[in-house]
Amino acid sequence: MNAPLGGIWLWLPLLLTWLTPEVNSSWWYMRATGGSSRVMCDNVPGLVSSQRQLCHRHPDVMRAISQGVAEWTAECQHQFRQHRWNCNTLDRDHSLFGRVLLRSSRESAFVYAISSAGVVFAITRACSQGEVKSCSCDPKKMGSAKDSKGIFDWGGCSDNIDYGIKFARAFVDAKERKGKDARALMNLHNNRAGRKAVKRFLKQECKCHGVSGSCTLRTCWLAMADFRKTGDYLWRKYNGAIQVVMNQDGTGFTVANERFKKPTKNDLVYFENSPDYCIRDREAGSLGTAGRVCNLTSRGMDSCEVMCCGRGYDTSHVTRMTKCGCKFHWCCAVRCQDCLEALDVHTCKAPKNADWTTPT
């Protein structure tokens, strides 16, 4: 009896290592490094060799990616603004989000998708703006073409989204491709879903040419939609994310519940249920909801009942300066007065034990 138990204890550390992802630094931290490309490439912890090579070889692309981090994190925070976990970032943490993304949850799925989408968007935009030496406008969009409105000429600058997707796949997926575990496959799937989401909203824009504004000739180009459209789309995918398990040969997924539909390449997938994010929990990486503003009249996720997890709330009476009495003056200005507005602000109470908790 002792021998089998001894064998179990011997293998337990290896089993836990396989099941639990390591707290790794990430290219997400590029936002915080700043400085020259060489400084950035050499000082972002956790980049694998192929990522560092791309970083040194394409400093202009890296600048676009690092500037784009702020954009997709802001979009993540916008989408989660009314939820207990609000996509808060930790400036001093190399993983940007701390331990909360160690869990293979819906939130992890969304962050990987929106970050991958953000890289595509940032690179493609930089190409169109002439900020990247290795790419420019889409070279395939030349000559004449036809759509439902008739013949048109490709002109202007079509966003070269294929280059953005190709570079994003090579850079973002590099670390995950070195892994063989379930979490690596989950991240790769959600990375791809994010890239596809940006391309989904590529739209054709046209300009008419002719006498008195007639559309005798049309010049058209392809342009990415505002990143908010991608964020809204991925938010819907987050709410419909599909829980999966690894298949028997370890090469893909199968649904965790046979009542679920099989995930497509556009869906987000996750393995583990999310924590409730109610209290500060060091192991889960949760900051809790103590002090968060809640909506007393809402019945949604931002309601005081849901946001505060039943702990109650404090009410503060505050005043703020607002614009009032606005009038339109010909021509062409709107003039307003500054008014003081009194309002009540409701914030979630802290739990009785407000310190970090460690689950037993």
UniProtKB/Swiss-Prot annotation:
Residues carrying the lipid (O-palmitoleoyl serine) are: S212
What sections of the sequence does the record tag as coiled-coil? none
Q: Where is the signal peptide?
A: 1-25
In the record, biological process GO terms are: atrial cardiac muscle tissue morphogenesis; canonical Wnt signaling pathway; cardiac epithelial to mesenchymal transition; cardiac muscle cell proliferation; cell fate commitment; cell proliferation in midbrain; cell-cell signaling; cellular response to transforming growth factor beta stimulus
Q: Which UniProt keywords apply?
A: Developmental protein, Disulfide bond, Extracellular matrix, Glycoprotein, Lipoprotein, Secreted, Signal, Wnt signaling pathway
Its annotated compartments are: Secreted, Extracellular space, Extracellular matrix; Secreted
From the record, give the cysteines joined by S-S bonds. C76-C87, C127-C135, C137-C157, C206-C220, C208-C215, C278-C309, C294-C304, C308-C348, C324-C339, C326-C336, C331-C332
Identify this protein by name: Protein Wnt-2
User: What is the protein's species of origin?
Assistant: Gorilla gorilla gorilla
Query: What is the gene name?
Result: WNT2
